[in-house]
UniProtKB/Swiss-Prot annotation:
InterPro entries given in the database record: TMEM237
Residue ranges, compositional bias (Basic and acidic residues): 54-71
One annotated Gene Ontology cellular component of this protein: membrane
Subunit structure of this chain's protein: Part of the tectonic-like complex (also named B9 complex). Interacts with TMEM107.
GO BP terms in the entry: cilium assembly; regulation of Wnt signaling pathway
Protein name (database record): Transmembrane protein 237
Length: 400
């Protein structure tokens, strides 16, 4: 009774495997390999427990309380293995903060020396929740971002609404002249622009096609006039010849004396009118299609007949040009150096009179043929009309 009862030393609870992984006992530099089988880890835990928790000799066997303390950590270890890694680390820190008391030789409970605890470096895992909260805060709606209709309505009216007042024109305007802007009166500027517009309307632009078409139509009008004038001149010429020659060409010397002054002028005029009339008649025929022109002539087309008769009259008139020269140079046979000998007047003049008669008849018939349809011109339709098609049947086939 007088002696204080000495309590037996308390055995340390077994350290769980998860805690041993994080906190080494005596060798801080030694790291436990991660790739271990469950059997090897269990055997190592058993050896550590026997080495650490062996009671000293001469001590009493462990009591019921100590046994309960030894069994309790086992159950806790089984539960802790199911917990996540963060909770295990917090539990180990709590246990290390409150170590159990160890009895010394005198039987007094003494706190064990704190062993250096070296924690294993842990990998930092990315925390997704703070990031989500950060983005959620950024996407939050603030009061400044909310715009009411009352605030936006005056701004929209000031920017987009048109002025209600009527704009008044300014008296002076600035016009760029020689790379400089000069002030000018609006009324004078409007007058000058109106004059320019009127002049542009009065002078339409002409193309080469328009000029060619106008020239062609003007020449056709001249040709129509030459046809009638040539027919009249030819008839007048033959009438004058027969009047001056007398009955049955009995007075040819009188014809030579009276007609020699008219031979050159009249023959020149007749030749000019025949040339114009022949070209004008040919313009009315489509010579681009030779077969069509020959077919029209054989079918007695008035335009084809007129062109042929004019060409024949022109050739006959040129064939009698030498006789006209001799008539112009007529002198009596009694005069020295005369081109007309005695008795040859009838031999020279008779063919000339017949040719002039034929020319008058041909010219008159041609004028009658062309006067039937004076506006008909196939050359104009071919050259200047875009609606004329060379092969209408083929065009229909291609379009189909």
């Amino acid at each position: 009774m007088g002696k204080k009862q000495v309590r037996p030393p308390r055995a340390l609870p077994p350290v769980p495997s998860a805690i041993q992984d994080d906190i080494p006992l005596s060798r801080p530099k030694k790291k436990k390999p991660r790739t271990k089988t469950p059997l090897a880890s269990a055997s190592s835990e058993g050896l550590v427990q026997t080495a650490v928790h062996r009671p000293p000799e001469g001590s009493e066997p462990p009591t019921k309380d100590s046994i309960e303390h030894q069994e309790a950590p086992v159950q806790r270890r089984q539960k802790k293995t199911r917990l996540p890694l963060e909770l295990e680390t917090t539990l180990t820190q709590k246990k290390t903060a409150s170590p159990s008391l160890l009895p010394n030789e005198n039987g007094i409970n003494v706190e064990p020396d704190e062993e250096p605890v070296i924690q294993k470096p842990r990998r930092k895992t990315k925390k997704t929740q703070p990031a989500e909260l950060h983005y959620a805060n950024e996407l939050g709606v603030e009061d400044e971002d909310i715009i009411t209709d009352e605030q936006s309505s005056p701004e929209q009216q000031s920017v987009f609404t048109a002025p209600t007042g009527i704009s008044q024109p300014v008296g002076k305007v600035f016009v760029e002249k020689s790379r400089r802007f000069q002030a000018a009166d609006r009324a004078e500027l409007i007058k000058t622009t109106e004059k320019i517009d009127v002049s542009m309307d009065m002078k339409p632009s002409w193309t080469t096609r328009d000029v060619a078409l106008s020239v062609h139509r003007a020449f056709r009008m001249i040709g129509v006039f030459s046809h009638g004038f040539l027919a009249g001149c030819a008839v007048w010429n033959i009438v004058v010849i027969y009047v001056l020659a007398g009955d049955e060409l009995s007075d040819l010397s009188n014809l030579l004396q009276q007609y020699k002054t008219l031979a050159y002028p009249f023959q020149s005029l007749l030749y000019l009118l025949l040339a114009l009339s022949t070209v004008s008649a040919f313009d009315r025929i489509d010579f681009a299609k030779t077969s069509v022109a020959i077919r029209n002539f054989l079918a007695l087309d008035p335009r084809a007949l007129a062109s042929f008769l004019y060409f024949t009259a022109l050739v006959l008139s040129l064939s009698q040009q030498m006789t006209s020269d001799r008539i112009h140079l007529y002198t009596p046979s009694s005069v020295n150096g005369s081109l007309w000998a005695e008795g040859i007047e009838e031999q020279v003049l008779q063919p000339w009179i017949v040719v002039n008669l034929v020319v008058a008849v041909l010219v008159g018939l041609s004028w009658l043929f062309l006067s039937y349809r004076p506006g008909m011109d196939l050359s104009e339709e071919l050259m200047f009309s875009s609606d004329v098609e060379e092969y209408p049947d083929k065009g229909i086939k291609v379009s189909s």
